[in-house]
C-alpha cells in the first residue's frame, strides 16, 4: 500500500459563488439533494469519457461537500449539474484510483476524519469546511487497484443495501 496526496491521483475543481451565476445556472446547481440522490442511486454508473468543463459534473466524477464533508459518485441523474462554492469536483485518475474506493475512503476512513479534525483545530466554528489547499494535500491510502475496486464495490453494495432497507422501513 502507498499513500498519495489527492492532487496526485485526481483533478480537483472548485465552484463559484451562486451570486455570480446566471439564473439558468442557479436552477441547475449541484446541492445537498443532488448528493443524497447520487448516494442512493441504484443504477449502474458509467464514468464519462468526455472531458467536461471544470464547472459541471460528469457521470463518474466525485462530488465532495466542503461543509461537513461527504462524497458521492455522480450519477447520470445529476450529471451536467453546475459546481457551486459548497462542493468540490474530483475527477479520479482511474489508472491510479477507483472512484468508489475514493468515495468510501473520503466518507468512512478514520484517517480522513483525523486529518479533518486536525485541520479544524483553531477554528472557532463547529462547522468544518475544507479548504482547497487542505483538500489537494489530503493523504489517501491506496492499496493496489484491484483491491480498491473490490473495496469500492463492497461499499457501493452497502450503500444500495442501506438505501433499500431505509425504503422498506418507510
Predicted feature residues:
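Short, surface-exposed beta-edge/turn micro-motifs
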Residues: 27, 59-62, 85-87
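A short beta-sheet element
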Residues: 67-108
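Short, surface-exposed secondary-structure edge patches
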Residues: 51-56, 78-79
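A short glycine-rich beta-alpha junction/loop motif
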Residues: 81-87, 122-149
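Short Ser/Thr-interspersed hydrophobic loop/turn segments at strand-loop and sheet-helix junctions
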Residues: 6-16, 32-37, 55-73, 105-117, ...
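Short, structured beta-strand/loop micro-motifs enriched in basic residues and often containing a Trp
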Residues: 40-48
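Non-catalytic DNA-recognition/assembly elements of restriction-modification systems
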Residues: 1-28, 35-39, 142-170
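Short, well-ordered beta-strand micro-motif
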Residues: 31, 89-91, 139
Amino acid at each position: 500500500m502507498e499513500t498519495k496526496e489527492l492532487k496526485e491521483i485526481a483533478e480537483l475543481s472548485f465552484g463559484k459563488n451562486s451570486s455570480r451565476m446566471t439564473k439558468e445556472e442557479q436552477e441547475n446547481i449541484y446541492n445537498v439533494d443532488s448528493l443524497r440522490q447520487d448516494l442512493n442511486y441504484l443504477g449502474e454508473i458509467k464514468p464519462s469519457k468526455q472531458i467536461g468543463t471544470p464547472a459541471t459534473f460528469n457521470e463518474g466524477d466525485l462530488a465532495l461537500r466542503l461543509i461537513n464533508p461527504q462524497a458521492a459518485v455522480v450519477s447520470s441523474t445529476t450529471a451536467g449539474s453546475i459546481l457551486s462554492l459548497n462542493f468540490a469536483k474530483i475527477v479520479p485518475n482511474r489508472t491510479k484510483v477507483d472512484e468508489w474506493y475514493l468515495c468510501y475512503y473520503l466518507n468512512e476512513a478514520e484517517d480522513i476524519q483525523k486529518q479533518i479534525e486536525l485541520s479544524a483545530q483553531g477554528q472557532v466554528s463547529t462547522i468544518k469546511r475544507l479548504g482547497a489547499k487542505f483538500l489537494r494535500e489530503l493523504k489517501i491510502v491506496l492499496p493496489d487497484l484491484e483491491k480498491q475496486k473490490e473495496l469500492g464495490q463492497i461499499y457501493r453494495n452497502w450503500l444500495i443495501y442501506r438505501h433499500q432497507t431505509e425504503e422498506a422501513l418507510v
